[in-house]
């Protein structure tokens, strides 16, 4: 598959999947594998508004992304003919294939509430949780605004309405009942759609800096990490979830890892502790146990790296302070009072 970038201003960046390029240097790309891709554009990458389109593309098709400078919008088009001899060859990374392996067009159509194979969003696109926001300063979406329709659930009320006593207590701790209810009511009896939604929300945050998607990603993680019975009864599915989570964490940049506050307040770490305790108790099979060990190893490495990076930054601040002190001492052991000089600075 080939894709041409048409009409782009030199100040823009365009991207595919997890890569971004100056628009002026990228007339097009070729050899793109068929499947789910995310095309993005931004005038001030990586800061500022980032727009994009999730797309199911086909290897035997040709496409263009056309930029309209008046409206500052872009659209993805199918083409009959495209001369791509001067386009750059593109190769999807193995990580991208794994990060999107669970996503189908049907999952995207459900979340974006639209037909077709192209699904547009940007950093500011509303999510359905915004409809019930209690923040008086928050502008709620209008009827015409685009909306991401993520699964809605309340982790604090994860039990069946008919559950009482010990059963209710169990379902308050173990979110498996809530997960299965969502599988039936939202994900069309297909638990893999939960992993698709986890993937879409993660990519929307990590690539488009969408913070509504970030909150949903963390809620989905909390739901799945506390679904202990699910880990026992569906080991292959649960190991796939843990492997996906591990890959997502590994693909986050240092700044995204910090901005996401993924381990702040101890919520997810507490979930992981509970999961580890059940592993030690022998609750899970070898497949899930191995996936837990691999995930915990990755988290440990990321946290250690993050602490080292923070330490280096702190050292940098100390060095800057030391350099400043050295400069001061080179001029003498006192501070010059400019008001005593002949030509004071006003």
Swiss-Prot record:
Modification type Phosphoserine: residues: 160
Subcellular localization: Cytoplasm; Nucleus
GO biological process: mRNA cis splicing, via spliceosome; spliceosomal tri-snRNP complex assembly
Any GO CC annotation of this UniProt entry: nucleus
Domain of life of the native organism: Eukaryota
Keyword Nucleus: yes
Disulfide bonds: none
InterPro entries, A to Z: AAR2 (IPR007946), AAR2_C (IPR033648), AAR2_C_sf (IPR038514), Aar2_N (IPR033647), AAR2_N_sf (IPR038516)
Transmembrane segments: none
Coiled coil: none
Function: Component of the U5 snRNP complex that is required for spliceosome assembly and for pre-mRNA splicing. Involved in splicing pre-mRNA of the A1 cistron and other genes that are important for cell growth.
Name the record gives this protein: A1 cistron-splicing factor aar2
